[in-house]
Amino acid sequence: MNQKTSLLARIANGSLVLQIISGIILGVILASISTTGANNVAFLGSLFVGALKAIAPILVFVLVASSIANQKKNSQTNMRPIIGLYLLGTFVAALTAVLFSFAFPTTLLLTTGIEGTNPPQGISEVINTLLFKIVDNPVNALLTGNYIGILVWGAGLGITMHHASDSTKRMLSDVSDAVSNIVRFVIRLAPIGIFGLVAATFAETGFDALAGYGQLLMVLVGSMLFIALVINPIIVYVKIKRNPYPLVFKCLRESGVTAFFTRSSAANIPVNMALCEELKLHKDTYSVSIPLGATINMGGAAITITVLTLAAAHTLGIQVDFMTALLLSVIASVSACGASGVAGGSLLLIPLACSLFGISNDVAMQVVAVGFIIGVIQDSAETALNSSTDVIFTAAACEAAEAKEAKQAAQVS
């Protein structure tokens, strides 16, 4: 009995990253040996993603409410610079996608579209959807995972409870801690869940279906890697004035890997919260910035929209000048920030961007169909970039603020 307890303790206290890597390797091996066996363990992945999606809304709600209610007077949350980084990162990602698309022009084999999809008819519809998400019923927001509504209601409750009695605010803080402990337990199950996700992905799709879209995937993934490994580190360096790569690699390893396989920014919110706690960031800051980042920090989505739209333009022989490409970057950035307000996310915002070039909705929906075909890679890479960048920018803004405060304190003394 003691040996079993000791083994479980070693597993529970072992390196989560190494365990996740082991789960990935075992999932690939199982899928290559037995497709049936891989399909049989697919439920492990579904359970893990389901658990994350179930706990994430209540986690965000209580953390936001608790952090605002218990916020000390004159304390800084650093939200303004973080939002600035989110918007800058999304726009630069779209611009990078334009440059990659011009450097490596890609054409598509367009055949049939996707039936039963309803893309937004314009940017006003995206904004309209987002506004109605803000005034969503709080219970419905929690049930459906509407993080815009959850943020608004959590912030509203926190503000109104800011002047409540200390015992009430302490109770809210205790509930927040209890939910956080449940999240830690769920995250420890990540190796098992990712094992099931990897096995199911390889068994169901493999990579044969992606062979015909090699160049498109190279442009998409290449743009995302360039943002993750070059642009984001430059932005972070400007903020913190030191080597950014230890922070960048840690976030990619501990947030990006999980997000790559769950393919859900919402499901990765608890993972990012735990990483922020490990990095010893200010709780009042990350409890708001992480769920907000899952909503508006969409560099990966901006890349997807831009690359596929320009691929459609190249396929149809449409000449794209610099100013039009710049306008596309702006449209892709704004659209990407609204991707969480559209069922189907970034792919169904492609027709909106295609309309800039006069591309018909029928052709645009064929481009969306291509997006669904390569989704096993595109969606995974997009989510990994989006989610890991949330932590990177939050950490950079927090560290820059701390350095500024330390400098001011030194000048005063």
Swiss-Prot record:
Residues passing through the membrane, by range: 11-31, 43-63, 82-102, 141-161, 192-212, 216-236, 298-318, 339-359, 363-383
Catalytic activity: L-serine(in) + Na(+)(in) = L-serine(out) + Na(+)(out); L-threonine(in) + Na(+)(in) = L-threonine(out) + Na(+)(out)
GO cellular component: plasma membrane
Role according to the record: Involved in the import of serine and threonine into the cell, with the concomitant import of sodium (symport system).
Higher taxonomy: Bacteria, Pseudomonadati, Pseudomonadota, Gammaproteobacteria, Alteromonadales
Protein biosynthesis listed as a keyword: no
InterPro entries tied to this protein: Na-dicarboxylate_symporter (IPR001991), Na:dicarbo_symporter_sf (IPR036458), Ser_Thr_transp_SstT (IPR023025)
Domain of life assignment: Bacteria
Similarity section: Belongs to the dicarboxylate/amino acid:cation symporter (DAACS) (TC 2.A.23) family.
Entries under Pfam families matching the protein: SDF
Example GO biological process: threonine transport
Compartment annotation: Cell inner membrane
Primary site of residence: membrane
UniProt keyword annotations, A-Z: Amino-acid transport, Cell inner membrane, Cell membrane, Membrane, Symport, Transmembrane, Transmembrane helix, Transport
HAMAP family cross-referenced by the UniProt entry: Ser_Thr_transp_SstT
Membrane topology summary: Multi-pass membrane protein
Listed name of the protein: Serine/threonine transporter SstT
Family annotation (PANTHER family): PROTON/GLUTAMATE-ASPARTATE SYMPORTER, SERINE_THREONINE TRANSPORTER SSTT
SS bonds (residue pairs): none
An example Gene Ontology molecular-function term: neutral L-amino acid:sodium symporter activity
